[in-house]
């Protein structure tokens, strides 16, 4: 596994931190478009979502992740119905609430630190 792949993957330790912090899907807790979901199974929180995605070298750390259900994770990743920007704003505010010194620039993998 490359250093980049390892750095962007959520470890078991980070996953546990996120699950303990969130206690469920952050968007379900805000009741964000849950009424539109036709399959209750999709609302089961079982995935870790990146704020800055792996495709943009987002780190696999608690400050860059939240617990989510399949419904909301898919909605966030695919930008369904033009909701991605709004969801990212909610996600950002949620993370800022938990980490006073939260900074997006610290969430991205840097091969060279200069």
Residue ranges and their predicted role:
Residues 1-9:
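Short Lys/Arg-rich cationic patches that frequently serve as NLS/NoLS or arginine-rich RNA/DNA-binding motifs
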Residues 8-47, 69-71:
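Short cysteine-rich loop/turn motifs with clustered Cys
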Residues 37-40, 55-66, 74-114:
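Polybasic, low-complexity binding patches
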Residues 49-51:
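Catalytic histidine site
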């Amino acid at each position: 596994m490359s250093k980049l792949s390892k750095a962007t993957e959520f470890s078991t330790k980070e996953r546990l931190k996120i699950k303990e912090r969130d206690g469920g899907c952050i968007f379900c807790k805000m009741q964000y478009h849950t009424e539109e979901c036709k399959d209750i199974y999709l609302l089961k929180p079982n995935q870790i979502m990146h704020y800055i995605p792996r495709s943009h070298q987002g780190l696999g750390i608690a400050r860059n992740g939240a617990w989510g259900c399949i419904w909301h994770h898919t909605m966030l990743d695919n930008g369904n119905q033009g909701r991605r920007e709004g969801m990212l704003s909610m996600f950002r505010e949620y993370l800022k609430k938990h980490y006073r010194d939260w900074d997006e620039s610290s969430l991205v993998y840097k091969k060279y630190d200069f």
